[in-house]
C-alpha cells in the first residue's frame, strides 16, 4: 500500500483506525511493515475475491449479510473525536459540489445556466435535515462492494477505512444497499434491513 504524504488518506490515519477496528473485531488487514519516510505499508493480502467482481444475485444474501455483520461491529466503536472527525455540514456541502461538478457538468455536460441549482439545494437540504436527525455512530464512509472482500473464513474483509468518521448510522447502509455497481430489488433490501435491525446492538437505532 502506498499513501503519498500530504493527502488526507494518510498512513497515520490508516494505522490508527486499523488498531481501533481490530479491537472491535472488525476484519481489517494486518499491518506487517510501516515506513513513513517512503510512505509505504506492507499489509495482509485478503485475496482477489472482491465483492465488486464476485457478488451475484445467487450469492448476494450470504455476501451482504456477512458485510452487515462487519458494519455492526464498526458501528459499535466508540465515537472518539481524537481519532474520528465528524461528518459535518461542510463535508455534506462538499459532496453536493462533487455531484454538480462530476454528474451535472461532467456526465450530463450541462452548462451552469442549465443546472437547476435551486432545486438541487432544496432537495439536498431536505435530505440533510432528515439525515442529521438520525443517531450517530462510526461510519466507514465508503462501505461499498469495491472495498469489501469475501474471505476463505466466510467473513468479510474491510478495506479503505482510513476516512472513517462519526456520522448518522444510515450513511453506510445506503452505501451497501444502493451500491454504485449493483442494483438490488426492494424485497432483498427489506430483508437485509430486517437482518441488520435484528442484529444491531445499538439501542438508539
Question: Residue ranges of each PLM-predicted region?
Answer:
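Active-site-proximal structural scaffolding
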Residues: 24, 67, 92, 141, ...
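Hydrophobic alpha-helical packing residues
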Residues: 21, 74, 127, 192-196, ...
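ATP-binding pocket architecture of kinase catalytic cores
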Residues: 1-89, 93-94, 98, 105-108
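Active-site activation/catalytic loop segments of kinase-like enzymes and analogous catalytic loops
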Residues: 97-107, 169-204
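An alpha-helical support segment within catalytic cores of ATP-dependent transferases
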Residues: 79-86, 90-91, 95-138, 200-204
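Non-membrane alpha-helical structural segments and their capping/turn regions in soluble enzymes
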Residues: 11, 61-68, 117, 121, ...
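Active-site acidic catalytic loop and adjacent metal/ATP-binding pocket
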Residues: 74, 125-173, 180-187
Amino acid at each position: 500500500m502506498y499513501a503519498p504524504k500530504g493527502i488526507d488518506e494518510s498512513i497515520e490515519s490508516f494505522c490508527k483506525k486499523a488498531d481501533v477496528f481490530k479491537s472491535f473485531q472488525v476484519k481489517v488487514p494486518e499491518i506487517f511493515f510501516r515506513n513513513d519516510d517512503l510512505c509505504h505499508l506492507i499489509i495482509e493480502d485478503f485475496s482477489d475475491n472482491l465483492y465488486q467482481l464476485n457478488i451475484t444475485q445467487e450469492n448476494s444474501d450470504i455476501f451482504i449479510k456477512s458485510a452487515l455483520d462487519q458494519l455492526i461491529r464498526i458501528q459499535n466503536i466508540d465515537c472518539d473525536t481524537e481519532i474520528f472527525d465528524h461528518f459535518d455540514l461542510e463535508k455534506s456541502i462538499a459532496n453536493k459540489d462533487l455531484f454538480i461538478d462530476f454528474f451535472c457538468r461532467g456526465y450530463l455536460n450541462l452548462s451552469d445556466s442549465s443546472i437547476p441549482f435551486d432545486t438541487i439545494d432544496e432537495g439536498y437540504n431536505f435530505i440533510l435535515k432528515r439525515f442529521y436527525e438520525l443517531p450517530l455512530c462510526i461510519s466507514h464512509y465508503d462501505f461499498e462492494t469495491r472495498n469489501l472482500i469475501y474471505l476463505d473464513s466466510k467473513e468479510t474483509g474491510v478495506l479503505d477505512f482510513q476516512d472513517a468518521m462519526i456520522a448518522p448510522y444510515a450513511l453506510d447502509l445506503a452505501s451497501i444497499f444502493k451500491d454504485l455497481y449493483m442494483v438490488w430489488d426492494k424485497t432483498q433490501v427489506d430483508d437485509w434491513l430486517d437482518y441488520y435491525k435484528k442484529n444491531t446492538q445499538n439501542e438508539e437505532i
